[in-house]
Amino acid sequence: MELSPNNSTDQSLLDAQLELWHTTFAFMKSMALKSAIHLRIADAIHLHGGAASLSQILSKVHLHPSRVSSLRRLMRVLTTTNVFGTQPLGGGSDDDSEPVYTLTPVSRLLIGSQSSQLAQTPLAAMVLDPTIVSPFSELGAWFQHELPDPCIFKHTHGRGIWELTKDDATFDALVNDGLASDSQLIVDVAIKQSAEVFQGISSLVDVGGGIGAAAQAISKAFPHVKCSVLDLAHVVAKAPTHTDVQFIAGDMFESIPPADAVLLKSVLHDWDHDDCVKILKNCKKAIPPREAGGKVIIINMVVGAGPSDMKHKEMQAIFDVYIMFINGMERDEQEWSKIFSEAGYSDYRIIPVLGVRSIIEVYP
């Protein structure tokens, strides 16, 4: 029974509680997604042609017999959050027929784990790993106290994320695979949407490019461009060998190999203002003048750029707080402009074609 108009105050209280609950329990969306990834439910549905009943999913996933009834409840969360779709099985009423679960654009990104070029399973697995998630339980205390190190991750784990990747092979693989999966998707879109960014150059160095996913995508699309990756020695040691991409061990704070263009994909948001200026000054030393085609290509968020709907705005705001776990930050155009100016660059161009992220061309 609905509340009467005289009880509008009560309804307002219930509406407020609903909003509070929606945010409080939002972590269950992430945990449901993590479970779906662990069980490889998207693969199970894909193996049945993109639509599968619960019993068909059960035939493909490894599930303890006592958990069968709980899977239906998990799928209810995953369908209401649009990870999967649902439709009634033909031949019965909507009330008594077993639902058929279908793939959505979201769950298609979860097919194939690391075997699919555009699969985002490794990235989601990285972000939802306890090592990444646990520092945020300290976020409130972080705001109240001046800690010995401003990095929440280091405060929680005793060392920074890049130190941990160097010492923990399992975590290192998790991070490398996660970042590589994001690079494969976003650079693929960048090439299709703004191919002109990569035209007119004969060489490119991907600074902090990890195991080379972005550089390999660019090399494949533009075979005439000689691509290389600069990263720390322990990262380069695990890079693929059968590729046209050259891997160079080094430190971007010391020097960057010469090239027509430098790519910084999801790098600068890890660093504070002064460090960004240092990195970009080294980039400027590595590239020729603008007249000769020299430029820096940045793939990162520009807060306020791109689509203006609430989902995009919310994601930019959320990611800005997320990146605080390594003392990073997202920046608006004014903040980017100040960094470019201090690093000695003459001009820049923002190309907002990557959803919540943008391509920024920066010219010496």
Curated annotation (Swiss-Prot):
Cysteines joined through disulfide linkages: none
InterPro entries xref list: COMT-like, O_MeTrfase_dom, Plant_O-MeTrfase_dimerisation, SAM-dependent_MTases_sf, WH-like_DNA-bd_sf, WH_DNA-bd_sf
Pfam family, one: Dimerisation
Active site: 269 (proton acceptor)
Domain of life: Eukaryota
Keywords: Methyltransferase, S-adenosyl-L-methionine, Transferase
Transmembrane region(s): none
Example GO molecular function: S-adenosylmethionine-dependent methyltransferase activity
GO biological-process terms attached to the record: biosynthetic process; methylation
Enzyme class, broadest EC rank: transferase
Amino acids binding S-adenosyl-L-methionine: 208, 231, 251-252, 265
Tissue expression pattern: Accumulates preferentially in the roots and is located predominantly in the region of the endodermis, low levels are seen in the leaves, stems and other shoot organs.
Subunit comment: Homodimer.
Similarity-based family: Belongs to the class I-like SAM-binding methyltransferase superfamily. Cation-independent O-methyltransferase family. COMT subfamily.
PANTHER family found in the cross-reference section: O-METHYLTRANSFERASE
Function text: May be involved in the O-methylation of suberin phenylpropanoid precursors.
Protein's UniProt name: O-methyltransferase ZRP4
